[in-house]
């Protein structure tokens, strides 16, 4: 009797376990298979910090831009019949990779880590578990000077941000270099800015589909770094993008930076130059595009680096342009007119923005020594970063950036060139963008990132480099096996909290009052927030004197002295002619005097 009851009990337990397994399986399947407007996608569960995040990697959001679609705006997808397996990153878009320091982690970490292909328009989604309802969405746009980049880099992994802040993180690939930004403005076969239109189509995908993942399409924050931040600010300037997002975060980049946007004329000229180099010079634009579409992408990559004759270490060979569609005018003009999305922005820069560019060819600089440069090397560096600027213009930079009270320090020229490059290209444009935004009555918040990562592979003299706040924004120090310091883990958590607060509420302070308050940036006080492992501080007027030099004084110097070298050449030529006339007159006079004296003796 007892044995029979035991059998019944065992059967009951087995049935219960079977039902539980089936329930869990269906629950799990429900979590990792989601129906989008184009079809079903299967993701995967990732263990993260004692919990779980569901990741969907490599979801297509556009037709592959192959063949006749090369150089054209991205085309919407049709439906797929089966379940799309979104469990691994997709191809990276074609690009030239950084071969400057083979095997060196500091440069290799930014190179694409998946196969290169033109079939690259895919996006990734990370959602917290259990699946949320109406969660805030944060969309990441990578940088890389519009020439390189991919969403699959380890440093852009969205799982920690999704897990800790219970936000949905999205990132997308977009076309870069000539394949993304070659332009014959006005021609629909190659209108330019197709890399930006890729981003825009991904934003449309989020609006249509993110609710199925548990996201709120009315709470979407764009965030990006360097060219990614410039992209974010271009979406702020592009009316078609305005309904597709709510707020914006700009890390070390803005659309008014000198490298961010080229004129229609210059964009067209670069396309024609590439066509000439690659053997595609033709009588009309249609034939040029037809020829370029038949070229191997690797051949285009090889030649695109030669289209700027005076290339600097910050050259953007093919980037955004004024196409009359995505971008109707130069960013400075649109900012001046107040033609941008009225919303909240969070903007910031790193302490040593310039050093990352100096080691790629500035005279006397190297990652393998302290790069103590001379005055002559400083001046040669200015020639590289400011081609076409008159000698007087370059001397004005040297005069402004030299510390004349402490001009015996060995590091003075190295630090000065770091500041020149960082201020001109990153810091001052970002501050100017923020001022213009704030002046129109929008809430803006500005940060100054001061912490040098303990894991940074670059030498100590390079300081708090361009791009190295990203790992803290994405929570990489939370992964214990990587061996960041405890202070860095706490610091990273605080940054993720402030970024997520801003995304959720439009204010990095959120609803908490127990920490230092991050003030709103106003153009009269210009308060900004310092970010480091110590207690944050509120300071005012970051790089105010230097930025006045770049925004007010230097443009006047260029205007007055832009053709001074030509004037000098003309003056010298004129003086040489006059001198010849005078010498000829003197010779004639001497000859006359001599003859006169000869005649007097007769």
Swiss-Prot record:
Belongs to the type-B carboxylesterase/lipase family. Its EC number is 3.1.1.8. Present in most cells except erythrocytes. Substrate binds at residues 144-145. One of its GO terms (molecular function) is acetylcholinesterase activity. PANTHER family: ACETYLCHOLINESTERASE, CHOLINESTERASE. This is Cholinesterase. PROSITE patterns: CARBOXYLESTERASE_B_1, CARBOXYLESTERASE_B_2. It holds the Pfam family COesterase. It is an enzyme of class 3 (hydrolase). GO terms for cellular component: extracellular space; plasma membrane. Residues 1-28 form the signal peptide. It catalyses: an acylcholine + H2O = a carboxylate + choline + H(+). Esterase with broad substrate specificity. Contributes to the inactivation of the neurotransmitter acetylcholine. Can degrade neurotoxic organophosphate esters. Keywords: Disulfide bond, Glycoprotein, Hydrolase, Phosphoprotein, Secreted, Serine esterase, Signal. It comes from Bos taurus.
